[in-house]
Amino acid sequence: SSTSLDKCGIMPRDKTHYLAPDQNDRSKLRLTLRQAREIIVEVTRIGAYGILMDENRVLLCRLSSQVPGFAGNWTLPGGGIEFGEQPADAMVREVEEETGLRVIPKVIVDAHSLQREFGGRNMHSIRIVYLAEVAGGELRFEQDGTTDRCQWFTEEEARTLPLVELGKEGI
């Protein structure tokens, strides 16, 4: 079956992928998925995040050990946009996954681009930040995810935390 990976010459077939200029000539190079990931040195990641306020407090989430180099730092809830997903829908989905809260996006308050090295790769992050309103749900912690705790903080409290750049923007 055809997938979006066909267009870039990486042909899915079971757990083995092929990298070849001609999609019909799979003899050039045969790679496992792990090997294919290792040769990718430039990554663009588009994410959507929410600023959630409760009176004078902002909701922040602590990054887990699944985020090497940033574990223990605090950030805004949110995450990667899936292929074909609208940014606002991604923010709603990611916030609920990480916090248990259902939110309504109100307005985009920031969109920016950041380039840095992460995990031995050149990473280009494009982030869309929404002001969002809590519409329901109950605050809980994500299990086995990129965050392990979420908590409401006043601006003064948040400034004492180890924050990633996105967390600093949120306060």
List each model region and its residues.
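A short coil-to-beta-strand element that immediately follows conserved catalytic motifs
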Residues: R102-D110
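Extreme N-terminal basic, low-complexity initiation segments
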Residues: S1-M11, K15
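Active-site-adjacent beta-strand/loop module that shapes the phosphate/pyrophosphate-binding cleft
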Residues: S113-L139
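Short, well-ordered beta-strand micro-motif
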Residues: L52, V129-E133, W152-T154
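Conserved Nudix-box catalytic region and its N-terminal flanking loop in Nudix hydrolases
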Residues: D54-E97
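A generic structural micro-feature
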Residues: I40-T44, F70-N73, G120-I126, D144-T147
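Nudix hydrolase/Nudix homology domain
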Residues: Y18-L19, A71, R140-I171
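Acidic, metal-coordinating catalytic segment for phosphate/diphosphate chemistry
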Residues: Y18-I51, E55
